[in-house]
Amino acid sequence: MLGVVATLRVKPGIEGQFEAVAKELVAKVNATEPGCRLYALHRAETAGTYVFMERYVDQAAVDAHRATDHFKTLGRKMGEYMDGRPDVVRLREVE
């Protein structure tokens, strides 16, 4: 299993707009990507900071996720609300 933890900072005052788009992405990923075992958005204690937690069965599932229309379209839309680039950590499960 592979994991991804992506921390995003959102511009002040538009958190609700960001959350609406992000929740749409979460719903589409969970409904259509069988290789993705976890795709969840969390609000951090720090204002305007969000964390996506992701878990995939293999690299092919990660690649498939990144190639979807919903990831490309909604990811670009979320980018409009972000304050800088996301901090992404890629993980490999210890078996």
Language-model region placement:
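Short, surface-exposed ligand-recognition loops at beta-strand->loop->(often short) alpha-helix junctions
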Residues: V10-Q17
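Short alpha-helical
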Residues: G13, A47, D69, T73
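Glycine-rich beta-strand-turn "strand-cap" elements at beta-sheet edges
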Residues: L2, A40-G48, L74-E95
